Amino acid sequence: MQRDGLQAYFKGGTALYKALKTTRRFSEDIDLSVDTRGCSTAQNNKRLERATKRYEALPRDPSQSVTHRSEVISVYNYVPVTAYDADDALQRFGKLKIEATSFTISEPTESLEVSALIYDLADEDQRRILKSEYGVAPFQVQTITLERIFIDKLFAAEAYVRKSDIEHRAFEAAKHIYDLAVMREHPKIVQLMQDAAQMEKLLNIRMTEEMERHDGIPGVLPREFTFFTDAAHKPEVRKAYDTMQRQYVLREQDRIEFAAAALALDRISEQLSANEAWQKCKMPLVSLDDRAPATYSESKTGHEKRGMSKSRKRNPER
């Protein structure tokens, strides 16, 4: 779809673990951020449906589709090639969910090489067979950057920990806490937490996006985040974390004890507190709808913005 010009970008947990070249936490749902700025309602809906319902490699189950104003979810079925528990209550196997949202701001992005796990684990001879006989090979996908995913997870963890007494919120918080603990020592994240300019750009994007979220924390500034310490003192979060690891962190060596994860949050908090942009971040002056459509030229050192006038509309969807 990206090759055909669809402005949809890979994000979320599955994108994270594809970027890290590991499957430490089981995640195969595909989350997409779809850029619909400057689009009419009809064009918005068309882009979301195109991002979720137009794939032909797997059969789609229309009965499981969900459509909201700025979100479309589709579920595709497949037959796993390995043995699995057919009564698995979590339905982790045999179904692939694709979720596309347009309330998110699709920037910054980068090209990510993605490959199937079977390819990653194969030796050179096996890879040649996979390529020549089965067409299994790495490919490029436009993806929300690792640094932006990290910022998103900070905000998500704060929102879910604050509401951890509500059903399912503690479990969602647990997944983000685990991911943050995994990401903390990645070189790109270490650099981000020391880079005030990059931090400021990402926080401005996320704070603007937060204004549009129905289940977010639009009135909370980054320096007011409390989940770094609160998570360790909420029994429902601790319980959910242990459950999440049993269900989604399939290898024992990939599991992180809750105390170690809490310590990782403390270290993240200390590093963020030393970042001027984190401390001085302010509420955005415009909402997502006020932002003009834009294209971005990516580089290792920054993202050059080339704005378009708000009065100019995008071409109608073809």
Residue ranges and their predicted role:
Residues 1-8, 18-24, 35-287, 306, ...:
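Structured mid-to-C-terminal alpha-helical surface segments
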Residues 10-14:
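Glycine-rich beta-strand-to-loop/alpha-helix junction loops that act as flexible
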Residues 289-304:
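Long, low-complexity intrinsically disordered regions
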